[in-house]
Amino acid sequence: MFNNIIKNISKSIVGNEDRIKLTLAAIISEGSILIEDNPGSGKTTFAKSITLNLGLSFKRVQFTSDLLPSDILGFNIYKNEKLEFQKGPIFTNIVLADELNRGSPKSQSAFLEAMEEKSVSIDGETYRLPEPFFVIATQNPMDSSGTSSLPDSQLDRFMISYSLSDLNEIEKINMLKNGFDLLSIKSEPINWEDLQIKKKKVKVSDEIYKYVIEIEETIKSLDQNIHVSARCLKQIIDLAKGWAIVHGKDYVT
């Protein structure tokens, strides 16, 4: 199932097959992804290509310094003598949060809180986000102008973070020849419910659980100031299950 998706995405995003697989594994595990790279490196194109090939609804939010929380979450308006809630772009399966660290801390916080809770609270009313729901966020390096760094407590909400690979000469030639015609490479939509059933059946041995705890203990021994959260440990296991499914296996190795 995923071989075709990976093949299609690789037609427009060359030289990043491992990151494509890692992103799909995170999405299967209902985790969110943070891509950090320089402007013009293809972050947005990469994220769009992933979403188009999953057959899920998605919307893009361009973060800027003047973006308000209500521009993301939604707001109430008075219509026909009553308040009606107008949903923001966060009400979709996949949100592409473009240049997240260009937004104000207030907008970042509101967005990431909704991402964590998978719901939006406005004027005392709570609105659930669609299922499945996850975020593919991009950000520019901290030394780029107009950026504000995300605190560790917010970075912890992302399952994985990476930069895109540098292309070799052959890959650059292929990119220049083929361009970024994303609309022509869409795959068949995946069955999300079947996928979640399959994920629950993935076997994880006690040795794998012990190995994850060993990773935590090693990190702590190297730097006592680094805290490995329980959420992080769980996400490692979930990501491993997603990685197994991407590779057509029903067990974690």
Tell where the protein language model's regions lie, with residue ranges.
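Canonical AAA+ ATPase core
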Residues: K79-K82, E99-S107, M115-P189, D194-K201, ...
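Conserved alpha-helical scaffold flanking the Walker A/P-loop in AAA+ ATPase domains
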Residues: K21-A25, N76-L96, L100
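Short beta-strand-centered segment that lines the nucleotide-binding/catalytic pocket of NTP-utilizing
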Residues: S57-P69, G124-R128
